[in-house]
Regions:
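Short beta-strand segments
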Residues: 62-65, 89-92, 138-139, 185-186, ...
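Short, structured patches in soluble enzyme cores that scaffold and shape functional sites
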Residues: 90-93, 117, 137-142, 160-162, ...
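Active-site histidine-anchored catalytic micro-motif
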Residues: 59-126, 134, 223
């Protein structure tokens, strides 16, 4: 329930009129022989999320929950901007590039990006998968061997935590995709454990909040945002949630505040 509590804690600081809630079943769900834990529960959440998204207009900021919320959010953003070429920047300590066959845990949050790329359980693969050429992994520093091999074989672009300290590094990687618009995924474990406590799978040598906010700001200075996701907030107690919320709200602000790009400036 920590992920549910994390999402609820963030919701408490968001404007109610601009927030919609997706119902999440409390049952454990079944794998149905797919090698994916809780598959049927994931299907139910995806259906509910798609129903809510169908009634929205404009870019949506999706608050998880785990990274599986991107199964509904990213295809929705791409379909809403079908005339544009979209890059997905995946800020995450982990690649989320396992498959049911390679996953050590069979937990779906480690397979989300692979599924969005069209290689995952059939019931969850989107109708129009991403291409590896659209994806930029940012701040990723913990990969299983099969994930690393998939990155090498597919040519997915990567920007390390060290490289993110260089201004413009992630924008340059996006430019190489040829995209005109961007979707930003943020798994909060991309941050260094010294920066945030409420994540389930912390990894050392991550970003500071300031570095992440700056990277998001640099992206938005060059590319319109078609949507974003913030995931994996799992505080252990309400008090711990309160300690982390100021950092999370800074990230939300970086994703939502108005931005005037150079081409939009008034002469």
């Amino acid at each position: 329930m920590r992920l549910v509590d994390g999402a609820a804690a963030i919701q408490g600081d968001l404007p109610a009129a601009a927030t919609r809630v997706v119902d999440v079943p409390v049952g454990a769900g079944e794998s149905q022989g797919t090698g994916v834990l809780r598959l049927t529960a994931l299907q139910s959440v995806l259906t509910n999320q798609q129903r809510v998204l169908a009634s929205t207009t404009g870019p949506v900021i999706t608050i998880g929950g785990d990274c599986a919320v991107e199964l509904g959010a990213i295809p929705h953003a791409l379909a809403s901007s079908a005339e544009s070429t979209i890059a997905v920047v995946w800020f995450d300590a982990h690649g989320d590039l396992n498959s049911p066959e390679t996953s050590p845990s069979h937990a779906f949050h480690g397979m989300v990006l692979r599924t969005l790329l069209g290689d995952g359980p059939e019931a969850l693969v989107p109708g129009s998968p991403l291409s590896p050429a659209q994806v930029v992994l940012a701040g990723t520093r913990s990969l299983d061997d099969d994930e690393a091999a998939f990155i090498d074989a597919s040519g997915i672009r990567t920007v390390t935590s060290t490289e993110l300290q260089q201004p413009g590094s992630v924008a340059e990687a996006i430019a190489q995709t040829g995209a005109s618009r961007v979707y930003i995924h943020v798994d909060l474990d991309v941050l260094d454990p010294a920066e945030i406590d409420g994540v389930g799978y912390p990894e050392p040598f991550g970003l500071s909040v300031q570095q992440l906010v700056q990277a998001i700001s640099q992206i938005r200075a060059s590319y319109p945002l078609v949507g974003a996701g913030i995931t994996e907030f799992a505080p252990s107690t309400p008090e711990a949630a309160s300690d982390d919320l100021p950092s999370i709200l800074r990230i939300i602000s970086a994703l939502t505040r108005p931005v005037q790009r150079p081409e939009e400036a008034t002469p």
